[in-house]
Amino acid sequence: MAQDFTVTPWEVKGKVDYDKLIVQFGTQKMTSELKERAKRAINDELHVMLRRDVFFSHRDFDLILNDYEKGNGFFLYTGRAPSLGMHIGHLIPFIFTKWLQEKFKVNVYIEITDDEKFLRNVDYTLDQTKEWSYENILDIIAVGFDPNKTFIFQDTEYIKNMYPLSVKIAKKLTFNEVRATFGLDTSSNIGIIFYPALQIVPTMFEKRRCLIPAGIDQDPYWRLQRDIAESLGYFKAAQIHSKFLPPLTGPEGKMSSSQPETAIYLTDDPKTVERKIMKYAFSGGQATVELHRKYGGNPDIDVAFQWLYMFFEPDDQRIRKIEEDYRSGAMLTGELKQILVDKLNAFLEEHREKREKAKDLVNVFKFDGDLARDMWKRIHV
């Protein structure tokens, strides 16, 4: 039987079967045993996204825990290709990375790929991608990272420090390998052909194992790193993979910045949030109130419930009650959507306040914090 979904770094289509994807990508499932080990390591409760299998797959997370338990530590790496506006789905890896930093007390490196964004789109100027970088950095800082253990860097600014190591990496990679992984062809400009080498450099910022929290669609990018890392004297990058927060329009695919009806943007005001949720959020309810009261709704396909489950309702008892009431028909679709609207608007209001304060912290994360100052003194070879 043909597979009815597609997951690549540049395209997600259909309703994703995550168990099949683990087999297809050759990753490992986040088992209950592994989660218990993580819980013991931090001596605290796990993040809601771990408890509820939003982060469901990994490569070498067991080795990360081994290193941590032995006192060797690890570091975190994530990044962002800047865009005109970030949506809720873009925040998931950053929120989880911040939690990992807080609980394991480790360094975080956040790469802003203003160069890649410029190279990939013929219509974008470098000034545009640099401007978007600043705006996106404000949203990232607002998540709450430790300013002395986090280094946020733009490729066009930090390139001198990374270039020697990126050249060594580039020499290990053939165009054939890069072409298949990054969706390139003979019409691709030579800048984007070189870029994958630059993306690998931060996985080698420390002589420790690197953990990358990201969407499962990003996994293929790091296979190249894992193929060459040990030959350069570094560890293979470990990853922990998240599922996709479903688009408002239904359980298939993922949110898209180019389709406003699929996403809630961090800049959406309360009325826009309410309008989008009420109009576009795919419902698992029945066609009429009478039928819904009689047969109940299906939270498994209901986007409002899925957003609450994956992100916005961390209280396990509360989410169970919402699920029970919706399945039984005691809670209507409109009531479920209103819960999400209220949660979303509270979250976005707090985010906007933190984002405003982040304007005073940009230079700390990029240049003046403890980790940032140390990184600007280093040339990576």
Curated annotation (Swiss-Prot):
Record localization: Cytoplasm
Any single GO CC term annotated in Swiss-Prot or TrEMBL for this entry: cytoplasm
Positions of short motif 'KMSKS' region: 254-258
GO molecular function: ATP binding; tryptophan-tRNA ligase activity
SUPFAM superfamilies given in the database record: Nucleotidylyl transferase
Keyword Translocase in record: no
InterPro entries assigned to the protein according to its UniProt record, in alphabetical order: aa-tRNA-synth_Ic, Rossmann-like_a/b/a_fold, Trp-tRNA-ligase, Tryptophan-tRNA-ligase_arc
Catalytic activity: tRNA(Trp) + L-tryptophan + ATP = L-tryptophyl-tRNA(Trp) + AMP + diphosphate + H(+)
Recorded superkingdom: Archaea
EC number(s) stated in the UniProt entry for this protein: 6.1.1.2
Major subcellular site: cytoplasm
EC main group: ligase
GO process terms (BP): tryptophanyl-tRNA aminoacylation
Keywords, alphabetical: Aminoacyl-tRNA synthetase, ATP-binding, Cytoplasm, Ligase, Nucleotide-binding, Protein biosynthesis
Motif ('HIGH' region): 82-90
Family label: Belongs to the class-I aminoacyl-tRNA synthetase family.
HAMAP family: Trp_tRNA_synth_A (MF_00140_A)
Protein name: Tryptophan--tRNA ligase
Organism: Sulfolobus acidocaldarius (strain ATCC 33909 / DSM 639 / JCM 8929 / NBRC 15157 / NCIMB 11770)
Lineage: Archaea, Thermoproteota, Thermoprotei, Sulfolobales, Sulfolobaceae
